[in-house]
Structure formats: C-alpha cells, structure tokens
Amino acid sequence: MDGFDVSQAPPEYRAVEPIANIFVLGMGLGWLINYVGMIYQSFKDETYGMAIMPLCCNIAWEIVYSLIYPSKSLIEQGVFIAGLTINIGVMYAAIKFAPKEWSHAPLVMRNLSLIFFLATLGFLTGHLALAAEIGHSLAYSWGAVVCQLLLSVGGLCQLLCRGSTRGASYTLWLSRFLGSSCTVAFASLRWMYWPESFSWLNSPLVLWSLALFLTVDGSYGLCYWYVRQYELSLKEAEGRKSK
C-alpha cells in the first residue's frame, strides 16, 4: 500500500482524515507566515533569515514534491505549491542581502549566487536520489526530516554566530514551530490510524529526530530572548553615554 495515496487509506484513517487535513492546513499556514515574514525581515534588516544550507535544502525538497512527485492530496499540493512560490522570494532576498553578512570572507561574498545555485542543485539531486533509493513516498518524509533538522540547527547556530537578532523575530520562530508541530500532529495520525504504511514513524531514528527538533527549536526561543536582552542592554548603555 502506497502511503502517499490517501485514496488507499484504511477506513480508520479516512474517519480522521478531516482532522489530519486541518493539521496540513495549519502546517501550510505556519510556513506561509514564516516565509512572508522572512521576506519582510530580510528587507527590513538587509540580511537573510534562514541559514544558506537549510534554505537550499528546503527549496529543493519543495521543488521535488511540488513538481516532480506531487502529492495526490489536493490540500497538500496546494500547500506545497504556495510554499514553493513564496520561498522563491525568500531565496531572492537571501541572495540579494547575503553579501553583507560575508564581508569577512571575500571569496564567499563574491560567489554567493553560485553557492546558492550549487547547494540547491546538490540537495535537489540528493532528494531525487533518496526517492530512487527508497521510493518517493518514504523519501518525502525522510527528506522533510533532514530539512527540519538542518533548519532547526542552522537557525540556532546562525543566531549564536551573529550574536544579533537581525533577520530573526519571535514571529518567525513561532510560525516555524507551528508549521513543524502541525506536521508532527498529522504524521502522528497517520501512524496511529494507518499503520500499514506509517508504522515506521515509530522508529528510533524518527523519535530521535523529533526529540532533537523539540530541543533545538525550544532552545532557539530562549537564546533569542537572551540575545535580544543583550542588544537592548547595549542600546541603553549607548544612550547613557550620549547623555
């Protein structure tokens, strides 16, 4: 049974499918808010919000599962295509403003467009290779796991390395967390009510990935608060000096 084709789902899953679809819409809403917010924040702060490698991996995954192996669920199709469309804007903003973050590394700064292109191409072929190896239904989920972990770890590392909240906000963090949490919720429904195709979601590696996502994304909020407080304390100190 192909777990990617909802029409083949057992009656138990079809009974809870409307609930699963709500979580799919929640996933889409969270990520669309995140993407639009990143574009806004990028132009506001003149930087990029998502780390380079996670961004390239993410847009490559969306290309594969929006255009090459589209879901048979119209709701998922709509969510993925909308996400890909807006993510192109995220990529544009990143390419436009990334050189300002790499002035300390001229070789990288001068070749960022090529780096974005090659990284996206590399991840695109990687997602396709994974689909050829284990089938696109499984690769869809495992590829998403890789994207999520790269995004979570990359986002936290970027925040700490910059020592600044430029390109970031609580809205971006919470919308990303909403989108990813809704993904976990509808995947859980598939595991519980469609075990013929999704029993593997209870595997140690999936559970480890879930724990890592929750730990890192939860830590991001705390670290963002700390960095923001540090920025505010610097502004207050500068204000006192100017007086």
Curated annotation (Swiss-Prot):
Would the keyword Transmembrane helix be found if you checked this record's keyword annotation? yes
Q: Where are the transmembrane segments?
A: 19-39, 48-68, 78-98, 112-132, 137-157, 172-194, 205-225
Q: Where does the record locate the signal sequence feature? A: none
Q: Specify the protein's topology with respect to the membrane.
A: Multi-pass membrane protein
Question: Where does it primarily localize?
Answer: membrane
One GO term describing the cellular component: membrane
Pathway-wise, it operates in: Secondary metabolite biosynthesis
Q: What class of enzyme is it?
A: lyase
Q: Where in the cell is it found?
A: Membrane
Listed GO molecular functions? lyase activity
Identify the EC number(s).
Answer: 4.2.3.-
Q: Which residues are glycosylated?
A: 111
Enumerate the UniProt keywords alphabetically: Glycoprotein, Lyase, Membrane, Transmembrane, Transmembrane helix
What family does the Swiss-Prot or TrEMBL record give for this protein? Belongs to the paxB family.
Role summary: Terpene cyclase; part of the gene cluster that mediates the biosynthesis of the indole diterpenes penitrems. The geranylgeranyl diphosphate (GGPP) synthase penG catalyzes the first step in penitrem biosynthesis via conversion of farnesyl pyrophosphate and isopentyl pyrophosphate into geranylgeranyl pyrophosphate (GGPP). Condensation of indole-3-glycerol phosphate with GGPP by the prenyl transferase penC then forms 3-geranylgeranylindole (3-GGI).
The molecule here is called Terpene cyclase penB
